[in-house]
A protein has these predicted regions:
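Basic- and hydrophobic-enriched, low-structure N-terminal and domain-boundary segments
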Residues: 1-106, 110-118, 123, 161
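Disordered, low-complexity tails and leader-like regions
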Residues: 6-7, 147, 440
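P-loop NTPase motor domains
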Residues: 77-85, 89-408, 423-424, 452
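Conserved ATP-driven motor cores of ASCE-family P-loop NTPases powering translocation/secretion/packaging/pilus
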Residues: 400-463
């Protein structure tokens, strides 16, 4: 009798399990993307979709470095497949950005950036990379120059005395010299003025949000114009070895003193200097907002400009800023070039220079692209490691939208979204613009739970 009871119980349990399995089976869900219990549209791509979307390129650096079988499709390596003996890279050849998320030590550089850089070298793409340890520069600087024929520039903020130069006024000086040799070529003068304005805007807005200026907007705008005017004066009249940003600071500081002589009451020496220029000189026009104001306001404008230039007063930084740029924006866009930026973790006060260089190079690249019909002849990439630790980049979200159509790709690498929220964008809308303008989000984290959380955050809250 006991055995019969046990048998009945076991049959009942098995029957209940079978019934529950049938009721809650996934077979009852129709083959639809949404609308039958699913949330969101995210799903895994099929093999056919992967094959149709990406270029499949045999990844063979040994042959590439010998000049054999070089790939022709420029783009980002977003995946791979293959066996132990051969690897095929999956390359997106479109104008896309990629957001890399990974905690320290998970292999962001070794397992993803190195293949991307190797492929960029093989296809002739110019690139800029930021690095805290200097590994990228040490491992790929010589390879890029020796095997792929690249122009190399290393801006090493850890060892400035061993660094290449990066004169912010390089392009202004270049076109001012060309204009003085050919006074009839107004296009050279126009380019010098354009790059002077780019430098001034980059310096004034570096690490700041123009929307937060409020009632002080006049002083920042006028300081930008005054800075543009001074840069033009330095490029036009100073000796070649003195045409750099430190000279701009020294001139503004010295000309802040009151003017001497009769008829100069209430004026400073900057205003007196401007009176010596012809009326049609653009430097006089750029500084117009500051010149045509009260004495106290004029002093405030000049003090604002000086305060934005204070960061450049460093004996080590001057070893970089006071010498000619190895690779300017035009050479970067038109020739195979690689710029390695090394930022010291032990001295974060120098990080502003990285943000400044990125912003200036970006704005100058847009200018080069506009001169070539709106697109660069050769695709360029910014590999921005530790993007989240850099000082705030003004209108960072606009960089992602404006650069894409110009054939400039940006690859920001962060450790978490909290970094972007803290340093780059304070408004949720701007953060979403950066995420949504990054067509790829590469997640590489140590724990599966954390990785699932990030993937869920990127795809949708209910996917």
């Amino acid at each position: 009798m006991a055995l019969v009871v046990v048998a009945v119980v076991m049959v009942s349990i098995l029957g209940g399990i079978t019934l529950l399995t049938h009721v809650y089976s996934l077979n009852g869900i129709k083959n639809k993307t949404v609308g039958n219990g699913q949330h969101g549209t995210a799903r895994w791509a099929t093999k056919k979709e992967i094959h149709d979307t990406y270029a499949e390129v045999p990844f063979n650096p040994k042959e590439w470095r010998k000049g054999n079988c070089l790939p022709t499709e420029q783009g980002l390596v977003v995946g791979c497949k293959g066996t132990k003996f051969d690897t095929t890279a999956l390359v997106d050849t479109g104008d896309v950005h990629a957001l890399m998320i990974g905690a320290a030590g998970v292999g962001k550089t070794a397992y993803w950036m190195y293949p991307c850089i190797e492929y960029a070298l093989a296809t002739g793409m110019s690139f800029l990379s930021t690095d805290t340890k200097g590994d990228i520069m040490r491992n790929y600087g010589t390879i890029a120059q020796k095997y792929y024929g690249y122009n190399i520039s290393v801006i090493d903020l850890r060892n400035p005395t061993k660094s290449n130069g990066n004169n912010l006024l390089h392009l202004v000086n270049k076109y001012m010299d060309m204009y003085q040799k050919n006074p009839k070529m107004l296009v050279y003068k126009a380019k010098a003025e354009k790059y002077a304005k780019i430098i001034a805007k980059t310096i004034i807005l570096s690490g700041m949000d123009a929307a937060s200026f409020g009632q002080n907007a006049y002083f920042y705008d006028a300081a930008e114009g005054l800075l543009s005017a001074t840069i033009l004066l330095v490029a036009e009249f100073c000796e070649p070895e003195e045409r750099h940003i430190v000279s701009v600071f020294k001139i503004i500081q010295e000309l802040l003193a009151p003017a001497k002589g009769k008829g100069n009451k209430g004026k400073n020496q900057f205003q007196t200097l401007m009176e010596l220029l012809p009326d049609e000189h653009k430097a006089k026009w750029f500084a117009g907002a500051a010149l045509n104001t009260a004495e106290q306001s004029m002093a405030s404008v000049m003090s604002t400009a000086l305060s934005r230039l204070n960061a450049f007063l460093d004996s080590e930084l001057e070893q970089i800023l006071c010498f000619d740029t190895e690779i300017d924006a035009e050479r970067f866009c038109n020739e195979k070039s690689a710029i390695f930026l090394v930022m010291p973790e032990e001295n974060p006060n120098t990080f502003f220079m990285i943000s400044l260089i990125i912003q200036q190079l970006y704005r100058e690249i847009l200018s080069v692209a506009d001169e070539n019909g709106g697109k660069l002849k050769n695709r360029c990439v910014f590999f921005c490691d530790e993007f989240g630790t850099l000082p705030k980049i003004e209108s960072a979200e606009m960089m992602f939208s404006a650069s894409r159509s110009r054939r400039l790709q940006i690859v920001p690498i962060i450790q978490s979204f909290a970094q972007l929220k803290r340093t780059m964008v304070r408004k949720a809308v701007r953060l979403l613009l950066i995420i949504h303008n990054s067509q790829y989000s590469v997640v590489l984290l140590q724990t599966a739970a954390r990785q699932m959380y990030c993937q869920k955050h990127l795809a949708a809250e209910q996917s």
